[in-house]
Amino acid sequence: LLIGQIARGIDGREAFQEVDFTQLYSGIAKWVTEIRDPKRIPEILAHAFSVAMSGRPGPVVIALPEDMLREEVMLPPQLPYSAAVEQAPTTEQLARLSSMLAEAISPIMILGGSRWSEEARQAIVLFAERQQLPVAVSFRRQQLFDHTHHLYAGDLGIGVNPALIARIRSADLIIAIGARLSENPSQVFTLFDIPSLKQNFVHVHPGPEELGRIYSPTLAICASPVSFALAVVDLPMAHLREADSIHRDYEAWTDVLPQTPGAVDMSEVMTHLRDKSPEDVIITNGAGNYSIWVHRYWRFRHYGSQVAPTSGSMGYGLPAAVAAGLRRPEKRVFCFAGDGCLQMTIQELAVLAEHKLKVTVF
């Protein structure tokens, strides 16, 4: 995030539009800085991208004093590129994970977070199939596993299937990949014992600060979902387990429509859209409770088919749909938005119309 700042030399005097951005953003950004010397632009931008992409990805804020922007300096024609720092499981960690899988009777895997890829998703599917692992997904991370797969168990968001909650509580091994297991997935921190789970707990996360932050893992692995998925796909097969029943529970939860009062039944609306739409449609939504019907009844099939906020920001759905339409113009995009949520960013309808995007707003 690049923000204009008052001129250098008058800061601290409450000049017109002066803001202490370090104080304002330090609680919600990974790094806040200011470029006071234009010669350092390549250095600071390279570091900013590295910080933003490494570990748990997050925002970086850079303030730009207005007088600094008017200076002329000689810089290289191409700025340096800083890739995200990658870490992978060690041989010892993989051996211990394999041993825990061999001993487990009722394991379950939970997928979440960011820094995934299509390759990682495919590798995790193969890993789950080889190990006969039921797979749940974290809050608004439903694109990470095909909902029609016989190992898919459901999502840990708002209005969770009680059968999934029971299955997790009775599990003897929980493997969380990329997920932090924060308020919504943990059902307001009631689903797992704190700080030590009664089950064996394997926590895989690219940010070391997240490992042991709330839950003490039996095995902590600092790795991105991509590097972990590619490392575990060829682990020895564990013994056969019965894993299909949890998918039948999911199907029952999403096929049986509860009776609701009123002329419009949103569960019927959602299942009708689901059954009549192409399987690769991209779904976006904002933060409101109206999204409960989307999360319960839509069956996500492909990676990249869901764009939704986990931070609780209203107004997210429409600009997300515009971005998806611009990025993948050949795809149909459905945006679900409540009235207040839509009005937060309703001006984006102009962009949608200007570019003639294949976006439908519900």
Can you describe what each PLM-predicted range is?
Residues S117-A120, A229, S291-V294, T345-I346:
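Short, well-ordered alpha-helical microsegments
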Residues H247-E330:
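Active-site diphosphate/adenylate-binding microenvironment
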Residues V61, H239-E251:
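Short, flexible loop/turn segments with low-complexity composition
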